[in-house]
UniProtKB/Swiss-Prot annotation:
Family, similarity comment: Belongs to the conotoxin O1 superfamily.
Taxonomic placement: Eukaryota, Metazoa, Spiralia, Lophotrochozoa, Mollusca
Localization per record: Secreted
InterPro entries: Conotoxin
Taxonomic source organism: Conus abbreviatus
Disulfide bonds: 43-57, 50-61, 56-68
Propeptide stretches in the record: 18-41
Protein keywords: Disulfide bond, Knottin, Secreted, Signal, Toxin
A Gene Ontology cellular-component term: extracellular region
Protein name (database record): Conotoxin AbVIC
Keyword DNA damage appears in the UniProt entry: no
GO MF terms, alphabetically ordered: ion channel inhibitor activity; toxin activity
Signal peptide, first to last residue: 1-17
Length: 70
């Protein structure tokens, strides 16, 4: 069942990526800029959301609460 779910989600992402790239080349630079700004943003303050890839300012993420520690 897990394998089927992963395959389904992968197919959805591929379909979404394909349809969003059709006929929208003029917005390509804008999407690239948005992605770069997300990659270069600062750390997440205490109490902010964190997950598998935590970027907490305190370098500590409470995984059970999904928030950055103080």
């Amino acid at each position: 069942v897990l394998i089927i779910a992963v395959l389904f989600l992968t197919a959805c992402q591929l379909t979404t990526a394909e349809t969003s790239s059709r006929g929208k080349q003029k917005h390509r630079a804008l999407r690239s800029t948005d992605k770069n700004s997300k990659l270069t943003r600062g750390c997440t303050p205490p109490g902010g959301a964190c997950g598998g890839h935590a970027h907490c300012c305190s370098q500590s993420c409470n995984i059970l609460a999904s928030t950055c520690n103080a």
